[in-house]
Amino acid sequence: VGNNKLVYNAFNYQLMSISQINENNKEEGVIRTFDEDENLISIAYIENSKGVMGIYREYYPWGVLKNETPYYTSEINGKLKNYYPDGLLKEEYTYYNNKKEGLATMYYESGQKFAIENYKNDLKNGDYYMYYENGNLGMKAFFVNGKREGTIEFYEEDGKKIEKNK
């Protein structure tokens, strides 16, 4: 890859992005973008003719990782992860060809699991569990093609089952 390309805001001359330019004068390689205070906010990798490749990373202004999105030929493929402002994992989803596929897990800011759900072709499919922050099950449901089926089971914070709903 050839030269670096720096893009500045025309009004205040603040750095907006740095990218690499190939011999055909197209962006290729690592691209970094910055906020108005010139804090790094994202890093991506562009591969000639294939688009975004690898892990796209976005950052909070104070430098903590905000999310990681796995790309292959500009489509999301793999585990997408979002983080709380302190850097702890907030949620993770598995993607295949830009669609949620498989297990997804959400977390409280404490790090304890909040919910677990399953996806098929971008729709909720299968068991869905929601938890109290103490780790006890709070709700259990089942989905088929994005629609709830059957009963929802609810539990008190101490784990005692409290009701069923249709």
Language-model-detected regions and their locations in the chain:
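Glycine/tyrosine- and acidic-biased, solvent-exposed loop/turn segments at the edges of beta-strands
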Residues: V1-K166
